[in-house]
Regions:
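Short, well-structured alpha-helical segments
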Residues: 32, 36-39, 57, 94-105
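Generic N-terminal amphipathic, Lys/Arg-enriched alpha-helix
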Residues: 14-25
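Hydrophobic, well-structured mid-protein blocks that either form specific transmembrane helices
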Residues: 80-113
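Short, small-residue-biased leader/transition segments that mark boundaries at the very start
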Residues: 1-8
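His-Asp-centered metal-binding catalytic motifs of divalent-metal-dependent phosphohydrolases/nucleases
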Residues: 53-70, 74-78, 99-108
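An active-site-proximal "capping" alpha-helix that borders the catalytic cofactor pocket
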Residues: 38-42, 73-88
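Divalent metal-dependent phosphate-bond-processing catalytic cores, especially two-metal-ion Mg2+/Mn2+ enzymes
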Residues: 23-51, 62, 109-172
Length: 172
């Protein structure tokens, strides 16, 4: 049990010191607070299922790291980053690594297909964080960060369309 607890602490320390700080370089809607909130929400959701909480924690921590190469394929790049992280292999099997990679690839809300596993469903749901104030703030921050050339009216239209596309009936 002592070795197991050390293993958990080592893994969490690694994620906190080496993975989470990478979010500092992303847009205002995808900073450290976003990663921490997705981890928190993912772990809450995980309590309702028979899942490996270490995998849930790790998936949530890595889910947006691919933003380092842009938004369009960030979910694919994030999965590749996780799979390429040799440090994780001291805690996870090859099969677990593949499951986590797939869950990260599947987390994107705009994906046409449902996530392949419960792990993908958990992180996808946690990433949607339906706190209205946070959702609105992140949508505005994303627009200002990625479309600085837009005036107020254009920003508002982009904001309105995004919220309708994502959260209205039939939204992704």
């Amino acid at each position: 049990l002592v070795g197991s607890e050390m293993c958990i602490r080592d893994r969490q320390r690694y994620v906190q010191e080496r993975i989470i700080p990478q979010y500092v370089g992303f847009d205002k809607a995808h900073q450290i607070d976003h990663a921490e909130k997705v981890i928190e929400e993912s772990l809450k959701l995980a309590l309702h299922y028979e899942v490996d909480s270490a995998m849930v924690y790790t998936i949530a921590a890595y889910h947006d790291l691919g933003l380092c190469e842009g938004r369009e394929f960030h979910h694919i790049v994030s999965g590749k980053i996780l799979l390429a992280d040799e440090t994780l292999r001291q805690w996870f099997t090859d099969e677990q690594m593949l499951q986590m990679k797939e869950a990260i690839e599947d987390h994107r809300a705009s994906n046409q297909d449902a996530p392949r596993s419960i792990y993908g469903k958990i992180v996808a749901e946690a990433d949607r964080i339906i706190d209205p104030e946070i959702t609105l703030r992140r949508t505005v921050q994303y627009g200002l960060s990625h479309y600085p050339e837009m005036d107020k009216e254009q920003q508002y239209e982009r904001f309105r369309k995004h919220l309708a596309d994502k959260y209205a009936e039939g939204g992704y």
